[in-house]
Curated annotation (Swiss-Prot):
GO molecular function: protein homodimerization activity
Positions of modified residues (N-acetylmethionine): 1
InterPro entries with a match to the protein in the record: Tropomyosin
Domain comment in the entry: The molecule is in a coiled coil structure that is formed by 2 polypeptide chains. The sequence exhibits a prominent seven-residues periodicity.
Record-level GO BP terms: locomotion; muscle system process; regulation of muscle contraction
UniProt region (Disordered), positions on chain: 1-56, 92-126
Listed name of the protein: Tropomyosin Cha f 1.0101
Assigned keywords, A-Z: Acetylation, Allergen, Coiled coil, Muscle protein, Repeat
Disulphide linkage map: none
Role description: Tropomyosin, in association with the troponin complex, plays a central role in the calcium dependent regulation of muscle contraction.
Superkingdom of this protein's organism: Eukaryota
Amino acid sequence: MDAIKKKMQAMKLEKDNAMDRADTLEQQNKEANLRAEKTEEEIRATQKKMQQVENELDQAQEQLSAANTKLDEKEKALQNAEGEVAALNRRIQLPEEDLERSEERLNTATTKLAEASQAADESERMRKVLENRSLSDEERMDALENQLKEARFLAEEADRKYDEVARKLAMVEADLERAEERAESGESKIVELEEELRVVGNNLKSLEVSEEKANQREETYKEQIKTLANKLKAAEARAEFAERSVQKLQKEVDRLEDELVNEK
């Protein structure tokens, strides 16, 4: 009987110990479940942040694409301005050639009409005025060409900076892909994900700064194109004035030649 009682007591003690272990394991299981739920919540929060960053990156890409489109439009406008300047150069060159021929005829008429000193002096004065105007037009056209060269340089500089922005954007996308892979590993990767999110945020700020600079350059291009358009109008007006002056000089030369013929 004593042996049975001892065995019963031992079994009861073992049962109590087993129940204690079961309670302990159940508590540990609950704690593990709580930690797992917390980890899942943190992962969901991290994924939500990643989605938000992806949305911001999509917006940044759209804004960058729009800025590139505007820059292309400005480059086309600059090319059109260059074409107009070239056409204006050709228009000015023709009156200059006519002016040279008229000057030769005027010099001949002046030599033959030495007696008509008053008419010859007036023709010489007109010739000098036209020469001065021609030189002034050439100087202004040179200045306009220099401004166009500067505008092309600024456009090339803008392309280079936008290439740099595109490279940084590709780096950000690569960082995001790696961050998504690390997010799947659970709680141990959350700290690394948060650090990468901070890096992505800094890159987004850099993109925003680059976009703001691009907008500023766009406004500068608009002002330059407006200035070039005004200068083109002024140059065209000067060219028309030069053409009228050449026509007037041609008439004067014809008149002097007629007088010379009549005197002979």
